[in-house]
Swiss-Prot record:
Family: Belongs to the UPF0102 family.
Annotated Gene3D superfamilies: 3.40.1350.10
InterPro entries according to UniProt: Restrct_endonuc-II-like (IPR011335), tRNA_endonuc-like_dom_sf (IPR011856), UPF0102_YraN-like (IPR003509)
Protein name per its UniProtKB record: UPF0102 protein BCAN_A0183
NCBIfam families cross-referenced by the UniProt entry: PRK12497.1-5
PANTHER family listed in its UniProt record: UPF0102 PROTEIN YRAN (PTHR34039:SF1)
Organism: Brucella canis (strain ATCC 23365 / NCTC 10854 / RM-666)
Amino acid sequence: MTDLREKKRIAFFRGHSAERLAAFALMLKGFRIVARRYRTRLGEIDLIARRGDLVLIVEVKARASFEAAQFAVTPQAMRRIEAAADLWLQRQTDRARLSLRFDMVAVLPRRWPKHVPAFFTAGHYG
């Protein structure tokens, strides 16, 4: 196996592990996970969580530091996440009642995941 292929495989499994840990942390806060790795033609959402009428669109980043996790979510990624969220929302029968929030969960080595509510807002990527 090539070095590049091995690195991609490790990153893939690290991402899955981080998403599982982030989902668990959100469930402990009372959220229900309604989708994992929700893919659309416009982008992918790592986690979609819901508590009542509040829906979290969650980007999960596994990095060595919190700062690295923050900078890993680029404006381009935010646009793709928002576009995918719009498609998801269109498919919800109760969409008129729902409030969307774009959060991030940073998964750091040997630490509990750090949940950042309202990491970005729709249309504001800076």
